C-alpha cells in the first residue's frame, strides 16, 4: 500500500526561458519548498517524481526548476499539474492543530452524541477557522473552531465532538 500524497501546490505558468515553472502554493508553509529535494507531479492519471534544482519566490508564487525539465517547451506542458508530497514530509504542527485536509470529511457530533453532519469545508476568517458542517438534509451549520466549541478531534475515527453555543442551530 502506498503512502497518501498531499497536495501542496499547482503549476500555473512557466517562468523565464530555462524551464522554470510558477507554482501557486496551496500550503500555509511555502518555505517548505526550499527543504524539498523532490515532489510528485500529477496531471490526470499520470504521476511522476521530479527533482527540484532551484527554488525562488516572486510575490505570492514559488518559482521551481526541475532537473528533468530542460527548457520552456517542456515546462509549458506542466501547466495545471499538481505538486504532491508524502504525508511523512508534512511540516509538523503544534499540539492541538490539524491540517484542513484531515478535518474535512470528519463526522461531527454534539456532546450528547447527536450526529450533526460532515465537515465539508474549513473557512479561514482571520480570527479563527470555521467548520462548514453539512447535515444529511443538506443544511449547513457554521461551527467556530474554538476550544470552547470544539471539544475533541479524533482523527483516527474521523470524529469531531462539539458543544454548540446557544442559538447556533437556529
UniProtKB/Swiss-Prot annotation:
Disulfide bonds: none annotated. It comes from the Bacteria. Binds ribosomal protein uS19. Transmembrane segments: none annotated. Pfam families: PRC_RimM, RimM. This is Ribosome maturation factor RimM. One of its GO terms (cellular component) is cytoplasm. One of its GO terms (biological process) is rRNA processing. Residues 94-168 form the PRC barrel domain. PANTHER family: RIBOSOME MATURATION FACTOR RIMM. An accessory protein needed during the final step in the assembly of 30S ribosomal subunit, possibly for assembly of the head region. Essential for efficient processing of 16S rRNA. May be needed both before and after RbfA during the maturation of 16S rRNA. It has affinity for free ribosomal 30S subunits but not for 70S ribosomes. It is found in: Cytoplasm. Keywords: Chaperone, Cytoplasm, Ribosome biogenesis, rRNA processing. Belongs to the RimM family. It comes from Desulforudis audaxviator (strain MP104C). GO terms for molecular function: ribosome binding. The PRC barrel domain binds ribosomal protein uS19. HAMAP family: Ribosome_mat_RimM.
Amino acid at each position: 500500500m502506498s503512502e497518501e500524497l498531499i497536495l501542496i501546490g499547482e503549476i500555473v505558468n512557466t517562468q523565464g526561458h530555462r524551464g522554470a515553472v510558477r507554482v501557486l502554493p496551496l500550503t500555509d508553509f511555502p518555505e517548505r519548498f526550499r527543504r524539498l529535494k523532490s515532489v510528485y507531479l500529477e496531471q490526470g492519471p499520470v504521476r511522476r517524481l521530479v527533482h527540484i534544482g532551484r527554488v525562488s519566490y516572486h510575490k505570492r508564487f514559488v518559482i521551481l526548476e526541475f532537473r528533468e525539465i530542460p527548457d520552456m517547451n517542456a515546462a509549458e506542458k506542466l501547466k495545471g499539474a499538481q505538486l504532491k508530497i508524502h504525508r511523512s514530509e508534512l511540516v509538523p504542527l503544534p499540539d492541538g492543530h490539524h491540517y484542513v485536509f484531515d478535518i474535512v470529511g470528519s463526522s461531527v457530533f454534539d456532546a450528547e452524541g447527536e450526529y450533526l453532519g460532515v465537515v465539508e469545508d474549513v473557512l479561514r476568517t482571520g480570527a479563527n477557522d470555521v467548520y462548514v458542517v453539512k447535515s444529511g438534509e443538506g443544511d449547513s451549520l457554521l461551527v467556530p473552531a474554538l476550544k470552547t466549541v470544539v471539544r475533541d478531534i479524533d482523527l483516527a475515527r474521523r470524529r469531531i465532538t462539539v458543544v454548540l453555543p446557544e442559538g447556533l442551530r437556529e
